[in-house]
From Swiss-Prot:
UniProt: arsenite binding residues: 33, 35, 39
Protein name: HTH-type transcriptional repressor AseR
Entry GO CC: cytoplasm
Cellular location(s): Cytoplasm
Alphabetized UniProt keyword annotations: Cytoplasm, DNA-binding, Metal-binding, Metal-thiolate cluster, Repressor, Transcription, Transcription regulation
């Protein structure tokens, strides 16, 4: 599937932030609760929420509310999904920063 220049620009702009790019790579594998992302990225909850809001506004992620908790996963039905996959699969699985963040994955505090 192809996308127009404006859509590609929005896609690349959203992914241009290192934190959002890594989040999206993680979402290819599974969903995450906000509390897990806070621990993994060692960022404040408002900062994580701001990144997630940008990803959600772009249509790249789904938000699933379960009680007071919010879980995020990749939106496989977004028009840019094929492009997202192509970009995200280019990230080296042995990337030092990606693996550092993955190693901090914890059991969700919300479970």
């Amino acid at each position: 599937m192809t996308i127009d220049v404006a859509a590609m620009t929005r896609c690349l702009k959203t992914l241009s932030d290192q934190t959002r790019l890594i989040m999206m790579r993680l979402f290819l594998e599974q969903e995450y609760c906000v509390c897990q992302l806070v621990d993994m990225f060692e960022m404040s909850q408002p900062a994580i929420s701001q990144h997630l809001r940008k990803l959600k506004n772009a249509g790249f992620v789904n938000e699933d509310r379960r009680g007071q908790w919010r879980y995020y996963s990749i939106n496989g039905s977004c028009p840019e999904f094929d492009t997202l996959q192509l970009i995200l699969h280019q990230i080296d699985q042995e990337d030092e920063l990606l693996n550092h963040i993955k190693q901090k994955k914890t059991q969700a505090c919300c479970q």
